Structures are given as C-alpha cells and as structure tokens.
C-alpha cells in the first residue's frame, strides 16, 4: 500500500454494523457537496470532560439524506449517532469522543469519512468527504497538572507606598461618617426651624409674612425630623 492511502474504514459508535468498504465512486448523477464544520478535528488530551469534538454536518439540498461516519481507527473513538438522516436544508451535530488519550496516540493522524447517500436502504452514495483527526498532548506535563506553579520570591516589601495608602483607607470611612453626620444635623436644624415658624393664617406674629409656612410644610418637616431621629438612634 502506498504511503498516505486510506485504509479500510469502519463505522464507529454504538451499534456499528461492522466493516465498511472503500466504496466505489458515486454513481452518475448529481453529486452533493459534503459540508462539515470544523474541517479538521483536533482533540486535546487535557480536556476536563475528556477529549471530544462536535462535528456539524449540513444538508444544503431539498431532500433528506442518509449519512454515516467511518474511521480508520474505530477502536480509538466513540461517535454518537454514527449514522442517521439529515433533514432538508438543515444540519445535525455529531459528537466524537477520543477514548484512548494515551501518549502513544499523540500527534497521530487518523481519518474520518462522512458519506451521504439517498434516502433508503439501497440509496446510492451521492457525496463523501474525508477529514483528519489528531490528538494533541497536554499543554503541561501530566506530573505537573494539579500543582500550582512556584511563585518567585517577591523580595523585601516596599513600605514607602504602603503606609500612606493604608492611612487613606482607614480615614475614608471616618470622613464619610463625619460628612453624613453633618448633613443629618443640618437637615434636622432646618426641620426644627420649619416647625417653629408660624402658620400662614396665624395672627399676631411679629415675623414677616414671607417667613410664615403652611400646615403641609410643617407636616413634611415633622416627617423628615422623625426619619432623622430613627437613623440617629440606629447608629
């Protein structure tokens, strides 16, 4: 066998019906383009959920097509839905899992073949496409996985910039509390002043008419004063 020639392929996945053949060229007639994504499969041995890839198969025609997935190394892979049907103008996702992620299989290229045929048990093959598959080694050696990388010695700490920063952080809540207290105190003084002012219809007051307030304003001032009292009591 010449180098690079495809080997006999088998269906992979649950319920595979046995060995397939290399297959003769498609019969005369329209040839359907086999549209798959991604065009190549790259598995990573350090994937948490296990080396797996999602292969999407598209059917651009107006009729349903039967598909099947073959592989040159069926013992290394599990294909969910290795054969079935693709609806017209639709697509289907095929999950392919590498079940033998051992070092001897790193960087070894395998080959998958996607065959499309007409609907029916004796449907003729109308399209096929070969895609390569490769298993990549982990990004880090296995003995280093699960261990944190050693951190370099940070050296002596720099105290020059730390002291002012800590001082500002400690003083910030105190400044905020002081400003809030002054704001509450000012609002309380204004509310008390509104309560002491005479009503608009009150007679005999020596204050000018502009300083007379309405009953509604006094009620609002009393409400605000009550809220401030509750806040101060809780703090």
UniProtKB/Swiss-Prot annotation:
This is Motile sperm domain-containing protein 3. It is found in: Membrane. One of its GO terms (biological process) is heart development. It is a multi-pass membrane protein. One of its GO terms (cellular component) is membrane. PROSITE patterns: MSP (PS50202). Its main location: membrane. Gene3D superfamilies: Immunoglobulins. Detected in heart, kidney, liver, spleen and brain. The lineage of its organism: Eukaryota, Metazoa, Chordata, Craniata, Vertebrata. Keywords: Membrane, Transmembrane, Transmembrane helix. Residues 1-31 are annotated as: Disordered. It holds the Pfam family Motile_Sperm. InterPro entries: Ig-like_fold (IPR013783), MOSPD1/3 (IPR039283), MSP_dom (IPR000535), PapD-like_sf (IPR008962). Residues 33-145 form the MSP domain. Residues 22-31 have a biased composition (Low complexity). The keyword Membrane applies.
């Amino acid at each position: 066998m010449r180098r690079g020639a495809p080997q006999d392929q088998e269906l992979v996945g649950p319920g595979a019906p046995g060995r397939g053949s290399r297959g003769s060229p498609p019969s005369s007639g329209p040839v359907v383009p086999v549209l798959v994504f991604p065009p190549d499969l790259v598995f990573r041995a350090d994937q948490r959920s296990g080396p797996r890839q999602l292969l999407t198969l598209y059917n651009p025609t107006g009729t349903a097509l039967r598909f099947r997935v073959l592989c040159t190394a069926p013992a290394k892979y599990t294909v969910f839905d290795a054969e079935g049907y693709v609806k017209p103008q639709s697509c289907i996702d095929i999950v392919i899992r590498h079940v033998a992620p051992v070092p001897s299989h790193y960087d070894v290229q395998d080959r998958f073949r996607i065959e499309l045929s007409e609907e029916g048990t004796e449907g003729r093959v109308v399209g096929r496409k070969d895609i390569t598959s490769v298993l990549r080694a982990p990004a880090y050696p296995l003995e280093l996985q699960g261990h944190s990388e050693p951190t370099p010695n940070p050296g002596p700490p720099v105290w020059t910039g730390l002291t002012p920063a800590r001082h500002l952080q400690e003083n910030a809540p105190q400044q905020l509390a002081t400003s809030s207290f002054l704001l509450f105190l000012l609002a309380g003084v204004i509310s008390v002043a509104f309560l002491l002012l005479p009503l608009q219809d009150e007679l005999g007051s020596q204050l000018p008419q502009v300083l007379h307030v309405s009953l509604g304003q006094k009620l609002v001032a009393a409400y605000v004063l009550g809220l401030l009292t509750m806040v101060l009591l809780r703090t």
